Design a protein with these regions (language model features):
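Hydrophobic/aromatic-rich core segments of domains that either
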Residues: 4-5, 10-97, 114
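A generic structural motif
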Residues: 48, 121-123, 137-139, 172-174
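Short Pro-Gly-centered beta-turn/loop motif in secreted/extracellular proteins
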Residues: 50, 153-175
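Surface-exposed loop/edge segments in extracytoplasmic proteins
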Residues: 54, 141-150, 177-179
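Short, solvent-exposed S/T- and G/P-enriched segments that are highly enriched in secreted/extracellular
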Residues: 95, 99-101, 106, 146-159
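Short domain-boundary/entry signatures in modular proteins, especially
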Residues: 109-117
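A short, amphipathic beta-strand motif
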Residues: 116-126
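Short, ordered, surface-exposed loop/turn motifs in non-cytosolic proteins
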Residues: 124-145, 164-166
Length: 180
């Protein structure tokens, strides 16, 4: 990115996060895994100002924070998330979506879009299925794309605060599968 002077939003946002962190500015990459309204995705950067995350584009020059071409698109996103490597117990990270392989995923959606809490429940023979996995998918480019994977608690439930829209959900538990 540095030598070539160009890159996609993912490369440029990773570059900007690294540059900001190298001079002591707390920064993170924020990402929409798939837009609900078109066949694409987007990544940008948030910086910590006091105790509040503010955003800027990775490659879109704007004269102030919290402005970017993607604001309207993000207001329709089902999921805007960030990730950290580690446990991530601080409330500054946002609402925990899940952990996998040393990576913790957090929802940043409420800062960008209207949201609601979705509850997913897995039952097997009428009893809770703890540990069931829910793959949350959106229809994009004529196929379903996974935007998050949740794991059920001891009551067989998982929750996530997501944007408003339609989801396709695949659930699996001990060789049993269901979809809705």
């Amino acid at each position: 990115v540095y030598r070539g002077g160009r890159g996609r939003c993912g490369e440029e946002s990773a570059f900007l996060v690294s540059a900001l962190r190298s001079v002591g500015i707390p920064a993170r990459q924020v990402y929409v895994p798939r837009w609900s309204h078109c066949g694409d995705n987007h990544a940008w950067v948030e910086v910590l100002c006091g105790d509040e995350w503010r955003f800027l584009g990775a490659c879109e020059p704007e004269p102030e924070l919290d402005r970017g071409w993607f604001v309207t698109a993000a207001s329709r996103a089902m999921l805007v998330h960030s990730r950290i490597f580690g446990q991530g117990g601080s409330p500054l990270h946002g609402e925990l979506l899940g952990r996998e392989g040393g990576v913790a995923w957090f929802s940043q959606t409420p800062r960008y879009a209207r949201t609601r809490v979705y509850t997913f429940r897995a039952l097997a023979n009428g009893k809770p299925a703890p540990g069931a996995r829910f793959r949350l998918q959106i229809l994009n480019e004529s196929s379903f794309h996974t935007i998050a994977v949740l794991t059920a608690n001891d009551q067989g439930e998982a929750q996530a605060r997501l944007g408003l829209g339609s989801l396709h959900v695949l659930a699996d538990w001990q060789g049993l599968f269901a979809e809705a």
